[in-house]
């Protein structure tokens, strides 16, 4: 992040507030574009697409929780479907699997109280806008308070390799 020219903060509800706090705590002083995540399937907002397409190094802080149904004391109580759902999100975040993140089951995500259900598809579209290769790393995953939290780092690693004859 420190080598980035500008920052896009993407979230919904409390995610934006938490993102601001994280940026202040880490002394971010560069340009900041904030975007409250629109509903799944909406196009990438023009100002985000322009920022990603620019020559600047842009960092994206995408804030969104997984399911809130991981334990009996969770906000949504225990729902066994949350295990497979959150595992698939963790795998997609690790693999920078844009297709999986853009095609989340929105009905199930709503039932599982997934705050990231609108955020992750937009982050995935950002990756798809870039022609480079991406590397993912899941740095944190836990379920405190029955809510699934992920911290993943996606890094652009340059132009795509070409294969073929």
Regions found by a protein language model. Give the residues of each.
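A general structural motif
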Residues: 4, 55-57
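Extended accessory regions or peripheral subdomains of proteins
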Residues: 67-76
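Flexible, D/E/H-enriched segments
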Residues: 1-44, 75-165
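Beta-strand elements within well-structured catalytic alpha/beta cores of enzymes
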Residues: 57-65
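Generic hydrophobic alpha-helical segments
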Residues: 44-52
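Hydrophobic helix-cap positions at the C-terminus of alpha-helices
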Residues: 51-54, 126
């Amino acid at each position: 992040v420190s080598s980035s020219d500008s920052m896009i903060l993407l979230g919904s509800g409390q995610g934006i507030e938490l993102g601001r706090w994280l940026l202040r705590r880490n002394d971010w002083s560069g340009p900041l574009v904030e975007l409250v995540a629109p509903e799944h399937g909406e196009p990438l907002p023009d100002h985000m697409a322009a920022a990603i397409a620019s020559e600047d190094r842009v960092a994206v802080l995408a804030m969104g929780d997984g399911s809130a149904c991981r334990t009996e004391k969770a906000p949504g109580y225990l729902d066994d479907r949350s295990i497979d759902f959150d595992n698939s999100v963790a795998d997609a975040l690790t693999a920078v699997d844009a297709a999986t993140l853009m095609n989340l089951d929105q009905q199930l995500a709503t039932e599982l109280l997934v705050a990231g259900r609108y955020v992750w598809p937009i982050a995935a579209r950002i990756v798809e806008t870039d022609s480079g290769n991406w590397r993912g790393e899941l740095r944190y995953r836990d379920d405190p308070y029955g809510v699934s939290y992920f911290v993943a780092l996606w890094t652009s690693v340059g132009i795509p390799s070409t294969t073929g004859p």
